[in-house]
């Protein structure tokens, strides 16, 4: 098996690199068709003022939050600035994590803060978006999906009648 691209000691196979590039291209093409309700540079732009507006305009009461490339870069730890943001968000809205990945340390971080975590979610399939709504005891139209992928997060939220926020990605200084 060919191995290329060594980032922080993680080797990727040629197949993984090709799949990543195809996913990036797919997301780019879909971003021309599927539009989020909100675009932000990073999650911290979703601040108290924006949350207040979302509550008033759309009746938002809960957030489905993605992990990788939304609140942390690659497979690194969640930066402290985003940990603080999550704590403040939790004070204003119901929060649940829905991610296609799974990381025991990240899951433990959220569970320790009484935030439900759904890993291996198979986004954009409807099942776990709806499961998240059930756990928050909210109808889909009262939920905001926050993520970095147009197909997985934005399309997944839209097809479930949810509001969506596209995060450009985690800033380098957030690492």
Language-model-detected regions and their locations in the chain:
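Substrate-recognition element of Asp-dependent hydrolases with the DxDx(T/V) motif
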Residues: 62-110, 122
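Conserved Lys-Pro-Asp/Glu-containing loop-to-beta segment of HAD-superfamily phosphomonoesterases
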Residues: 125-151
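Short, acidic/turn-prone active-site loops that include or flank metal/cofactor-
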Residues: 120-126, 168-173
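Acidic, Mg2+-coordinating phosphoryl-transfer loop and its flanking beta/alpha structural elements
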Residues: 146, 151-175
């Amino acid at each position: 098996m060919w191995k290329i691209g060594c980032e922080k000691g993680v080797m990727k196979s040629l197949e993984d690199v090709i799949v990543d590039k195809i996913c990036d291209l797919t997301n780019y093409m879909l971003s021309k068709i599927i539009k989020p309700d909100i675009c932000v540079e990073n999650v911290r732009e979703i601040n108290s003022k924006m949350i207040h507006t979302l509550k008033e305009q759309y009746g938002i009461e809960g957030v489905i939050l993605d992990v990788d490339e939304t609140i942390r870069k690659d497979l690194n730890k969640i930066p402290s600035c985003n940990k603080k943001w999550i704590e403040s968000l939790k004070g204003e809205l119901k929060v649940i994590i829905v991610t296609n990945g799974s990381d025991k340390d990240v899951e433990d971080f959220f569970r320790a803060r009484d935030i439900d975590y759904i890993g291996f979610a198979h986004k954009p399939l409807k099942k776990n978006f709806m499961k998240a709504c059930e756990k928050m005891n909210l109808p889909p139209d009262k939920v905001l999906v926050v993520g970095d992928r147009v197909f997985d997060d934005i399309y997944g939220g839209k097809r479930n009648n949810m509001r969506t926020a596209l995060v450009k990605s985690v800033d380098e200084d957030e690492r």
